[in-house]
């Protein structure tokens, strides 16, 4: 069975690479279309045995006059590859495929929905469902998304649930003090971290702050510091997609409000080695599927404070597997930081439960087999 995966980025969406790697081991023929055949994850796709086609099939929002050419390129790609199934992983590429091929295309199409943002805005949610044809299928990556499609009128038979998987073996709770040495911190200094790219506000959606909640993390720190004088914070991850101005804004905000006890670290590739150095991970998202920042922290044995939005409660349940707080609430974040660090035994108990949930839900070997079964079902229906 030949599957065409269409990805909007070569540098992100690591979950797609892990999925493709396992699909290849299961015997599927995989073609991956993404913007570069040499940058980012492209070589790893090729090492996994997938064919890579360099093509950008995201919606050219800044150059709308290029849309006809993008649609034509999409049709040419599909005619050349002749896939049994087309699997898209982002909203933009999904809309391009549907617009290019139309509702009557005989090829089954799968949209594995990685986030909740477009579904929170009626126009984009309607665009998603209205462009779909009878052979379109959705894979929700959290229960919130699954319920939302049902509310939008999509038949439950056309919406599967399968979480975005990761390589569990990459994460261990062994502390190596890599980060603490870099920061010049003692082993017993309370260290709280936020690990996430900096996504600039989407003004066309009315956002005035970044959707990952960096501003809230910065605002919470001085509040928590009053009760935990030795507290130190670190923000790991730089600007996404060239959002340098936004990164500079966050750095200025941090320097102004946190007076040297919040360190900004660049994007780095050794995240599995860094996580165990944290005493607590904070994931203060405003909108979210289930963030890998929370998944990876729990897999590394690190307690998590996160917000009660989107699919996060599938993983982090208040008082069961972590701490849940309302979004956009620095005071609540600060209170949860203090509670977690002052009650280490309880925080450890919650983390063990969170780790158990994460190891089950996000094991890429298991989730990819679910996707493979979805493929088989769709092909049998199309026959």
Task: List the predicted regions and their residue ranges.
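Short hydrophobic beta-strand element within catalytic cores of glycosyltransferases
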Residues: 303-306, 316
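Short, structured helix-loop element that forms part of the nucleotide-activated donor/catalytic region
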Residues: 42-46, 214, 232-260, 346
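A short helix/loop element that forms part of the nucleotide-sugar donor recognition site in Leloir-type
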Residues: 73, 172-185, 250
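A conserved, positively charged/aromatic
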Residues: 110-139, 152
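Short His-centered aromatic/hydrophobic patch
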Residues: 88-94, 113
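Aromatic "clamp/platform" in nucleotide-sugar-dependent glycosyltransferases that forms part
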Residues: 267, 286
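A short, well-ordered alpha-helix in the C-terminal region of glycosyltransferases
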Residues: 332, 339, 346-361, 370-373
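Conserved acidic donor-binding segment of nucleotide-sugar-dependent glycosyltransferases
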Residues: 318-319, 323-330, 339-345
